[in-house]
């Protein structure tokens, strides 16, 4: 198996920008620069930063600069402490794996899929230049086998659109069923 150099010993900073109370106070206090320094001192080589779409876009799909600034701050701290980063879109408009939310139209709606593509294009425009230390994870844990084929189609289209902007950035695609042993249900894209 090929090594994913720089992404072999990591930690997940969950609960900061995803599955959380989406307030400035929470974003500013839950995790900070000292946490990045600490994990670097432990020999960790990367952090995974899950984000919900509502950190970086409003209900109409317009970009929220304040959320993009938090991502930039994470990248700056990663660079300062010699860490790589996986930017994980944990939830997108129309889809969440969270209990009680689940799928709400993303896999059926071309409009929501287009919104997802535009969001990733914006992320690629802003952060693709950090391909030496930032990888993109398209969507966290697609959980239902019935979405396998459509998820592969969506991922293909999204990768193509990201690649036109950020051709060197690593892109991660999780398998179905909470990224478990369901690799036989997904194909390589």
Task: Label each residue range with its predicted role.
Residues 2-170, 175:
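Active-site mouth of glycoside hydrolases
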Residues 178-188:
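Single conserved hydrophobic/aromatic residue that forms the stacking wall/gate
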């Amino acid at each position: 198996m090929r090594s994913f150099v720089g992404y072999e010993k990591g930690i997940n900073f969950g609960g900061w920008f995803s599955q959380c109370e989406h307030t400035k106070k929470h974003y500013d206090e839950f995790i900070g620069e000292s946490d990045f320094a600490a994990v670097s001192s432990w020999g960790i080589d990367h952090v995974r930063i899950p984000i919900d779409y509502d950190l970086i876009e409003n209900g109409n799909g317009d970009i929220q600069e304040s959320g993009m600034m938090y991502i930039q701050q994470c990248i700056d701290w990663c660079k300062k402490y010699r860490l790589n980063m996986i930017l994980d879109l944990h939830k997108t408009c129309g889809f969440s794996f969270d209990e009680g939310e689940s799928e709400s139209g993303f896999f059926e709606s071309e409009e929501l899929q287009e919104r997802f593509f535009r969001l990733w294009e914006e992320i690629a425009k802003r952060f693709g230049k950090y391909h030496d230390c930032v990888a993109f994870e398209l969507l966290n844990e697609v959980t239902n086998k019935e979405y396998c084929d459509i998820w592969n189609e969506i991922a293909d289209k999204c990768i193509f659109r990201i690649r036109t902007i950020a051709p060197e950035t690593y892109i991660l695609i999780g398998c179905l069923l909470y990224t478990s042993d369901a690799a036989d249900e997904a194909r390589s894209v």
